[in-house]
Amino acid sequence: MARTVFCEHLKQEAEGLDFQLYPGELGKRIFEHISKQAWGDWLKKQTMLVNEKKLNMMNAEHRKLLEQEMVNFLFEGKDVHIEGYVPPEK
């Protein structure tokens, strides 16, 4: 049976992650309060950010920027701004 969490991003009960995907205290917080769906949404935004801003994960400043964007997206309800990107109409 799938584990459920109250997802802070979706603001509803949803299927939780199978295991902690991110290290440290932030990873524990994500595991306990973020759903699979919200994590998947973040991964799409993360890919766009890395590509559009040409982030290098070997650069500590770039990793810090990406982590802050992740916290903003998952816990603070702030969408990721990618210059020039217009989301498709639903």
Curated annotation (Swiss-Prot):
Keyword field contains Iron: yes
Keywords of this entry: Iron
Annotated GO CC locations: cytosol
Keyword flag Iron: yes
Domain of life per record: Bacteria
Signal sequence residues: none
InterPro entries, per database record: Fe_traffick_prot_YggX, Fe_traffick_prot_YggX_sf
Listed GO biological process terms: cellular response to oxidative stress
GO molecular function, one term: iron ion binding
Family to which the UniProt record says this protein belongs: Belongs to the Fe(2+)-trafficking protein family.
Physiological role: Could be a mediator in iron transactions between iron acquisition and iron-requiring processes, such as synthesis and/or repair of Fe-S clusters in biosynthetic enzymes.
Name of the featured protein: Probable Fe(2+)-trafficking protein
Higher taxonomy: Bacteria, Pseudomonadati, Pseudomonadota, Gammaproteobacteria, Pasteurellales
